Design a protein with these regions (language model features):
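Alpha-helix capping/hinge segments and adjacent helical runs
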Residues: 100-168
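Active-site lining segments that contact anionic ligands and/or coordinate catalytic metals
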Residues: 12, 24, 94-96, 115, ...
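Short glycine-rich loop/turn motifs that provide flexible caps or phosphate-binding loops at active sites
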Residues: 13, 34, 54, 91, ...
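Residue-level "hotspot" positions that anchor or transmit function at local structural transition points
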Residues: 21, 60, 93-94, 98, ...
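Glycine-rich beta->alpha junctions and the first turn(s) of the following alpha-helix
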Residues: 1-76, 142, 151, 158, ...
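Hydrophobic face of alpha-helices
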Residues: 34, 41, 65, 79-82, ...
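C-terminal helix-coil-helix/basic helical segment that borders enzyme active sites and/or dimer interfaces
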Residues: 45-59, 72-105, 118-121
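Short alpha-helical scaffolding segments that buttress acidic/His motifs in well-ordered protein cores
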Residues: 44, 85, 136-140
Length: 168
């Protein structure tokens, strides 16, 4: 391969350039999951406020409130993890552990938030074509591309085990 065609521009830098690219993409997936969760929360609350059961808004029922609260807390945790991974990435390092953790948590989180949103909509969420139904289907993809959840788990565990071994 000629010097002009080397990935990374310098011999020996190709892997680092490739890893930088995939880790950038994984950070982007995590951030997208956070954005999707925010949208889902912003869709579920008005529905819960407007839908009545037993002469009471769904939003006033403790079980529904718990689902809304859980969705927000998980979204906020994923946002914090993603922002920290991005901050470390922007510093020039490749924080693979933090990025895999953020991508794994955020992609699993958005599926749970989508499930909560669909649960709040009830049968209408399953039978009718609406934004939450579409997002419920679409969020499943986040656990697959740029490395499945199982690949992220493996990367996280391998990194932690290596770090522990290196300390000894």
């Amino acid at each position: 391969v000629s010097v002009d065609d080397l990935v990374g521009g310098v011999e020996g830098n190709g892997l680092k350039a490739a890893l930088r690219g995939i880790n950038h993409a994984r950070t982007h997936v995590a951030a997208t999951c956070v954005g999707q969760a925010i949208r889902l929360i912003n869709e579920m609350i008005p529905f819960a406020l407007g839908r009545k059961q037993f002469n009471k808004a769904l939003a006033d029922m403790p079980t529904i409130q718990n689902m809304i609260a859980d969705s927000y807390v998980e979204m906020n945790a994923a946002r914090s993890m993603t922002l920290e991974a991005a901050r470390l990435f922007d510093s020039g390092d490749i924080p693979a552990l933090e990025i895999s953790s953020a991508k794994y948590f955020a992609s699993e989180m958005v599926s749970r938030v989508a499930d909560n949103a669909l649960q709040i909509l009830g049968g209408a969420g399953y039978l009718e074509d609406n934004v939450i139904t579409r997002m419920y289907r679409d969020t499943r993809l986040f656990r697959l591309y740029e490395g499945t959840s199982q690949i992220q788990q493996r990367a996280i565990a391998k990194s932690l085990i290596k770090n522990y071994r290196d300390r000894k």
